[in-house]
């Protein structure tokens, strides 16, 4: 069951998705824009994070502009190993998304690293640690969209 959010929560969520203030006191700036106190903004964001609605607040970077590469990976993982496999994959800092899919290749994740060699090394480690050797890597050749905005 999704936690209840009110109109003020929605206004905060809409604002911080793409216009998070880069100031010394960002929550004060958000409050000023929305007619709230800094303390109320912090409390609401804390509650939204504690309830799992907000996963993280932080910067998003374009990997290619920083010299990094990215790939979409898929694994054919036995049902009884899915949780273990996902846990091991999630230990890698360059993993940004990790999903179970209803497919022969049933785990899909994205990985970013300074080089394809590093990605290949990480995938080899994952295979060794999990025993899952049916992994594919589909390196990005062109980025069409990297930003999602959810208007609430």
Explain the meaning of each model-derived region.
Residues 1-152:
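A compositional/biophysical signature of low hydrophobicity enriched in polar/charged and small residues
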């Amino acid at each position: 069951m999704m936690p209840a959010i009110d109109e003020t929560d929605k206004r905060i969520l809409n604002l911080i998705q793409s216009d998070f203030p880069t100031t010394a006191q960002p929550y004060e700036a958000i409050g000023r824009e929305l007619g709230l106190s800094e303390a109320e903004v912090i409390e609401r964001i804390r509650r939204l994070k504690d309830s799992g609605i907000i996963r993280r607040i932080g910067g998003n970077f374009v990997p290619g502009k920083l010299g990094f590469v990215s790939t979409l990976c898929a694994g054919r993982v036995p049902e009884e190993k899915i949780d273990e496999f996902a846990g091991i994959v999630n230990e890698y800092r360059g993993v940004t998304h990790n999903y179970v899919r209803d497919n022969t290749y049933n785990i899909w994740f994205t990985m970013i690293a300074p080089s394809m060699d590093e990605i290949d090394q990480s995938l080899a480690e994952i295979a060794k640690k999990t025993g899952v050797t049916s992994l594919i890597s589909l390196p990005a050749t062109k980025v069409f969209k990297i930003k999602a905005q959810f208007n609430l």
